[in-house]
Amino acid sequence: MILVDDDVEPVAKRRLRVGYLHVPLILSYEADTPAGAWGQLVVIALAEFLGMTLWFSATAVTPALSRELQMSATEASWLTMAVQGGFVVGTLLAAFVNLADLVQGRRLVCAGAVSGAIANAAVLVAPGAWPAIGLRFLTGVALAAVYPPAMKMAASWFVSRRGLALGLLIGALTLGKAVPYLMTTVFGDRWQLTLLAASGLSLLGGLLVVLLARDGPFLAPSRAFDPHAIRRLLRIRGVRLAIAGYLGHMWELYAMWTWVGVFATASFAAAGLGPSAAIAGSAAAFLAIGSGAAGCALAGYVADRMGKARVAVWALATSASCAVLTAAVFGTRPVWVFALVMLWGFTVVADSAQFSALVTEYAPPDQVGTALTFQTSIGFLLTMVTIDALPRVAGSFGWQYASLLLVPGPVAGTLAMRALVGKPGPSPL
């Protein structure tokens, strides 16, 4: 096993330890980044950006779609939860049938983007609420072939800059998830155009990745599925803590993304914006989610220099503080609400890639795929709890105080990540 000294030490000054022998790392910061790596990252990230426009395409048009299909409040909330559930099922099935060994990553991403686009567009002809929800579930299953394989492809091109690379990738898909909210500010109640536009972008992403993307030189061969692999992975302290931090992060993230537009709309209405509150709420949701792209990029850049766990602690603590402050700014001047949700959006996802990067470093190289799949699956399963619970809390206490439900997640994640700050871990080499 090759070990890398403290996670907080600059990569250029790290030393590799093999047994009791310390060998200076003579490679420069860029020396282990192969030619073409950054170009490949651009292709993969752009494909992710385009494909992930499907995720919130129905959520962004929930009011208009609910009226069209005469949905109840419970059915409307399932438009988003169905995607989460489909994604969980898809990632678990991918692990059990060993898709990563049977199909190239670029082909998986293409198949997921294309099939997801078809399922999403089919909502236009759904005869009722539950058929539409079923199609959104299938969209989530398809996206399970878009997100984790792309993450593994991107990681296969980088070693010392893996934190930045995955940060840029997560930033791209974050921006993609924000795009439907921007579409609603343009298309208004014409929800059909939002769904069709998202499906068209996803088709383009699938075509892009299958034609131009390829795996990098640091892709370790995967094992056949081992039912005991997860148990062995959880014996590794670094893997356990990285997953624990990720779960705290996911407790907050998707509930915030799903309902921040509703929170902002309610706040603007309380401030007296009247009919323009809904459009302003969609704009706030786009800016809140979209600002996360910059957060991911900055966090990735800093993480490779100051440590992934340390950056995660900062992001988790800040996002928890923002969740608390939502109660204070509710109903105040819109500029304060916009400022807070943008800061919240910037930090709530900034650490996302670092949990994945930590897992790729602590897990054995030939079990990285299983580790990422397990981490992603249980994380997205947890999101369904808070996505469902948040509007219920709002129904009892109002949107002013609903986001306080999300605070325990990042607090718990902060404690898990503090245990990893400055600790040596396995190298991704």
Sequence positions of predicted segments:
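Juxtamembrane intracellular "pre-TM" segments in multi-pass secondary transporters
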Residues: 29-33, 215-243
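Conserved MFS/SLC helix-loop-helix module at the cytosolic interface between two early adjacent transmembrane helices
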Residues: 91-126
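A late C-terminal transmembrane helix in Major Facilitator Superfamily
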Residues: 362-395
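C-terminal transmembrane helical hairpin of 12-TM major facilitator-type secondary transporters
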Residues: 309-355
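Helix-loop-helix hairpin linking two adjacent transmembrane segments in secondary transporters
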Residues: 168-213
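Cytoplasmic helix-loop-helix junction between adjacent transmembrane helices
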Residues: 137-171
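Paired small-residue
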Residues: 130-138, 336-343
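Extracytoplasmic gate region of multi-pass secondary transporters
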Residues: 58-59, 239-289, 293
